């Protein structure tokens, strides 16, 4: 038999590592027991945000030399739930937007739980929470789409924190970093050598193409080329100084 361990987390899945192997002898009924110790990875000791899947493969050979194999998978972790959420790194706050707080058990099956979320101001360099009081709070039901309206929150760096309780009463948390901004911002909301946002890159006779470009640098010169497919629409030099410019390109038949 062999026992292999894979480590799962929000950001990666590790390759399986063999942690045990050996031989056992079946009893008179043809049954045998495999000793399996669910060892943690030394790299993630006591890390609540990772869990493991242990693959136990047994290969049995009878006296006639016939061989059969079977594999079982055991999931284990310090928590019985995994909580995730997707929040765009750059989130436009001008309009309400939808979000889903996803909760799954360690086998990847959805689990319905109630939870809480809180949005905190953060340091724009490392996204560490910069204040104890959240700027927005609320509740959610896992795996259900809900709408957030943050238009009155100042542009800047934030951390969204969410938490639920698993079936053992243990807290399970998830964090997501985001920069909130408005299309009306006159300067980048965080220090940015290049700030780019394209609310509409496809256009027709009624809807122009629109994008915003800016920089936090002072007295910066930028060469800008705008293409529609392979066709160059415009080429110009920009002199920007801690500002954002909005560009609008109405559709023309000559663009093709």
Residue ranges and their predicted role:
Residues 1-256:
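A structural signal for beta-strand and strand-to-loop patches characteristic of beta-rich domains
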């Amino acid at each position: 038999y062999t026992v292999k361990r894979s480590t799962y987390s929000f950001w990666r899945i590790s390759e399986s590592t063999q942690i045990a192997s050996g031989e056992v002898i079946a009893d008179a009924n043809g049954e045998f027991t495999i000793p399996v110790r669910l060892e943690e990875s030394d790299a993630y000791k006591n890390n609540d945000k990772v869990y493991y899947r242990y693959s136990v493969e047994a290969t049995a050979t009878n006296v006639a030399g016939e061989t059969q194999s079977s594999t079982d998978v055991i999931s284990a972790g310090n928590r019985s739930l995994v909580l995730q959420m997707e929040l765009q790194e750059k989130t436009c706050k001008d309009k309400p937007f939808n979000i889903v707080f996803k909760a799954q058990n360690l086998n990847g099956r959805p689990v319905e739980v109630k939870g809480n979320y809180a949005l905190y101001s953060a340091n724009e360099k490392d996204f560490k929470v910069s204040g104890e009081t959240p700027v927005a709070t609320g509740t959610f039901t896992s795996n259900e789409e809900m709408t957030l309206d943050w238009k009155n929150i100042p542009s800047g760096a934030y951390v969204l924190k969410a938490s639920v309780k698993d079936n053992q009463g243990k807290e399970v948390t998830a964090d997501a970093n985001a920069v909130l901004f408005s299309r009306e911002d006159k300067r980048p909301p965080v220090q940015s050598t290049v700030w780019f946002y394209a609310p509409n890159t496809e256009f027709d006779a009624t809807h122009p193409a629109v994008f915003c470009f800016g920089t936090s640098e002072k007295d910066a010169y930028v060469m800008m080329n705008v293409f529609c497919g392979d066709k160059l629409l415009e080429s110009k030099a920009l002199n920007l100084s801690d500002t954002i410019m909005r560009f609008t390109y109405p559709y023309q038949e000559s663009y093709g």
